[in-house]
A protein has these predicted regions:
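Conserved N-terminal segment of class I S-adenosyl-L-methionine
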Residues: 2-184, 193-197, 264-266, 272-277, ...
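Short, glycine-/aromatic-enriched active-site segment of Class I SAM-dependent methyltransferases
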Residues: 7, 213-242, 247-252
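A SAM-dependent methyltransferase catalytic signature shared across enzymes that methylate proteins
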Residues: 30-36, 247-264
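Hydrophobic residues in well-ordered beta-strands that form the structural core
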Residues: 66, 212-213
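Hydrophobic/aromatic residues located in beta-strands of well-ordered beta-sheets
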Residues: 139, 210-212
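Feature marks short, surface-exposed loop/turn motifs that line or immediately flank catalytic pockets
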Residues: 148, 207, 218-220, 267-269
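Phosphate-binding active sites in nucleotide-utilizing proteins
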Residues: 189
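A short glycine-rich, Lys/Arg-flanked "PGG" loop and its adjoining helix->strand segment in the class I
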Residues: 194-209
Length: 297
């Protein structure tokens, strides 16, 4: 599928950073204004232009980049991911492949999928590994970069969609099409995790399953996923846009019409992560307003 067309916003206004939005003074998850700064880094060599600050909500413990990158900043970040050869050759890549097979096996007790969409698939390494566990499943992939087309050309996925899962054109085309949707360390890199979960529900078939892995901010090294760690990259921009406490994410899944069937801690190496399996159910009934009080003036 060709990339989803986007309108040209034109040149930015004077004094406007094309790679960063305006700083916000409330939590993107619960709306609280009780924020504290966890990380503040100066400018320097980095993955995307601009400085960065990581704030945490004192009420719901949601951590997020503030200000966050614009759509152009996110696209620049996606294009600077490691190369295919580098991912293949290092130890982390080999551990990740083994971890992918384990994650694919996690679905065996719940469903025999005919169709599976991997969101943020990149080079398509998860579908390639998962096919060893589910040989009769058709794996497709969606990713904002041309890597997804190369994954299709390499035979790791059957259909490739270049763009975002939340793009209306992609969501409409894939509506109720998949038995499983997977998101491996994808939600924390998106501008709006809630929108991603809603889009995933749209493209799942009734009783389809969502498989999610996200960093665990409550474990050792959890918050360090927001902070540079590699020697010689003292000011690299941190990758995740959000760190979501497990209780927040589970509550959101249930409110969107998912039944959480399994959660566990997992990761091939630090930082630790949560794996969540949720089944698509009917949306919960809308809250009914209480009847008017006849005694009220």
């Amino acid at each position: 599928m060709p990339p989803t067309p986007r309108p040209d916003p034109g040149p930015p206004a004077p004094g406007v950073d094309p790679f960063q939005e305006a700083r916000r003074d409330d939590c993107p998850w619960c709306g609280s204004r009780r924020l504290r700064t966890m990380v503040r880094a100066p400018e320097g060599p980095r993955r995307t232009p601009g400085t960065f600050v990581v704030d945490e909500c004192r009420d719901c413990c949601h951590a997020f980049q503030n200000p966050r990158p614009t759509a152009d900043g996110l696209l620049l970040r996606h294009h600077r991911h490691p190369t295919e050869g580098h991912i293949r050759s290092n130890l982390a890549g080999r551990l990740r492949r083994r971890h992918h097979r384990t994650a694919a096996r996690a679905m065996l007790p719940y469903i025999e999928p005919e169709s599976w969409l991997d969101v943020g698939t990149g080079h398509g390494y998860f579908p390639e590994a998962a096919r060893e566990v589910h040989p009769y499943t058709a794996f497709d992939g969606v990713d904002p970069t041309p890597r997804v087309e190369r994954a299709r050309a390499a035979g790791r996925i059957e259909e490739a969609y270049q763009g975002l899962l939340t793009d209306p054109e992609i969501t409409a085309r894939l509506r109720a099409r998949y038995d499983v949707v997977s998101m491996f360390h994808h939600l924390e890199h998106t501008a709006d995790p809630r929108a991603e979960l809603r889009a995933a529900r749209t493209i799942l078939r009734p009783d389809g399953h969502l498989l999610v892995e996200v960093p665990d901010p409550a474990r050792p090294f959890g918050t360090l996923t927001m902070v540079p760690r590699w020697p010689g990259r003292a000011h690299d921009r941190p990758r995740p846009l959000h760190l979501m406490p497990l209780r927040n994410l589970l509550a959101e899944l249930r409110s969107l019409g998912y039944e959480v069937v399994a959660t566990r801690s997992c990761a091939p190496f630090p930082p630790r992560a949560h794996r969540i399996i949720a089944r698509r159910t009917a949306l919960p009934p809308a809250p009914v307003a209480p009847p008017p009080d006849p005694s009220a003036p």
